[in-house]
Amino acid sequence: MSMKLEISFAPSALIEAGLVLSLKEAEATLPAGAATVDPSGIFAKAAATAKFKAKAMSVLDILAPTGSQADRLIVIGAGKAADLVDHDWLRLGGVAAANLKGSEAVTVFLDADGLTITAEGVRDFAIGMLLRAYSFDDYKTKKKDDDDKAPSAVQITLVTAVADAAERLFAAEGRAVVDGVLLARNLVNLPANVLGPVEFADRAKALEALGVEVEILTETEMASLGMGALLGVAQGSVRPPRLAVMQWKGGAPEGQPIAFIGKGVVFDTGGISIKPAGGMEDMKGDMGGAAAVIGLMHTLAARKAKVNAIGILGLVENMPDGNAQRPGDIVTSMSGQTIEVINTDAEGRLVLCDALWYCNDRFKPAFMINLATLTGAILVALANLHAGLFSNDDTLAENLLKAGLSTNERLWRMPLGKDYDKLIDSKFADMKNTGGRYGGSITAAQFLKRFVGDTPWAHLDIAGTAMASPKDEINQSWASGFGVRLLDQLVRDAYEA
């Protein structure tokens, strides 16, 4: 189960029984708080014995020194100050959280010699702790043996000279980011029998408590709008589709909104073009794009972002029954363009094309960004270390790449072009939904591009990063919540008033 961490901030602290964590810069002699924590100077001996060099994210765990009230002392290496980047404070917080087991009271000294720590860095350290503390075991009926010994909550005190400013920042922004990421992770981790399109739409509706305006379009309403592409995907499932439309109005009333659209295929069998059985259980995560969008909208509303933002979720289930869409079917999208369905497992783009057109037609946004676990081809190209970025606008793309570097939710820009676009021309309709074996992630993006007009647009293919990505300092869960921090940073950096 997730550890419950209750974090406070203080400029100083008296050490009582419990765990003490201290940061240490690689070239400094002593860790943070050494005069308080280590009056007998045992750290230097322990570090020499263990050959501890305080490399970034390394840990030295020692018994508390004589004269200290603490039970344990853990020193976390920060590496060389010159090598630290913004997202390293998140990682350091994650390392700290990974070493809390069994502790009820924890004091963390952050102001190490050689480090320049800001309120933003402390905020990010706290965020990293909370993200690392997350786990998903809601459906386990038997606890691990050590769960019974775990405290109901761990009291964390972050000790730093910038405590007051950090506390204000965390309250205003940090908690909102954590809650948005964890919302996205929870949704991706949930089994599909629990989270169908209707249930997902209900989760969107719950954002009304934060001041988000939410509309849920039913199957009938989508049919009246001509969303034949989205509805074609849904027709094989007994679970009806939904389109969730969320509006956060934090900017000027006349301000042009920005828009985020998420693919929400709550389970993807592939339809008639059915997937192999091996690994199909992971297709409960094929709504990772929609999860990121709802997490982002939660974050923007919770921190009262000064921006007008639209979030749209296309929510369907792709199943193979007697009413399912067939290869060779031709559907008419909301745009009026016709699509030959070559492969029913290329369904995400069919959902997104109607959602994109609806968004552009109704809201006239300044830009649209869609997120989707869209293609296996992006995994072949980029593994699960970068998400694919496709865009028709260089400024938007550069802003996204910058936010990716800042948050370590990394993107790699992929090509688009007329020669790729020709690959999705159809003999029988305006286009087909797959372009063949080669360049699959690119032809999928070219398909989406046909539905955005001249509006600045970016497509993030997060098939490799939304789930089953490598575990790291801030995430040990199958679901990552990828996209929430990235897009929140994008809004902060470039689009918030």
UniProtKB/Swiss-Prot annotation:
Mn(2+) 1 binds at D268, D345, E347. Mn(2+) 2 binds at K263, D268, D286, E347. Its EC number is 3.4.11.1, 3.4.11.10. Keywords: Aminopeptidase, Cytoplasm, Hydrolase, Manganese, Metal-binding, Protease. Binds 2 manganese ions per subunit. InterPro entries: Leucine_aapep/pepB, Macro_dom-like, Peptidase_M17_C, Peptidase_M17_leu_NH2_pept, Peptidase_M17_N. It is found in: Cytoplasm. Gene3D superfamilies: Leucine Aminopeptidase, subunit E, domain 1, Zn peptidases. GO terms for cellular component: cytoplasm. GO terms for molecular function: manganese ion binding; metalloaminopeptidase activity. Its cofactor is Mn(2+). The keyword Ribonucleoprotein does not apply. It catalyses: Release of an N-terminal amino acid, Xaa-|-Yaa-, in which Xaa is preferably Leu, but may be other amino acids including Pro although not Arg or Lys, and Yaa may be Pro. Amino acid amides and methyl esters are also readily hydrolyzed, but rates on arylamides are exceedingly low; Release of an N-terminal amino acid, preferentially leucine, but not glutamic or aspartic acids. It holds the Pfam family Peptidase_M17. It is an enzyme of class 3 (hydrolase). The active site is at K275, R349. The keyword Nuclease does not apply. GO terms for biological process: proteolysis. Belongs to the peptidase M17 family. Presumably involved in the processing and regular turnover of intracellular proteins. Catalyzes the removal of unsubstituted N-terminal amino acids from various peptides. PANTHER family: CYTOSOL AMINOPEPTIDASE, LEUCINE AMINOPEPTIDASE-RELATED. This is Probable cytosol aminopeptidase. The lineage of its organism: Bacteria, Pseudomonadati, Pseudomonadota, Alphaproteobacteria, Hyphomicrobiales.
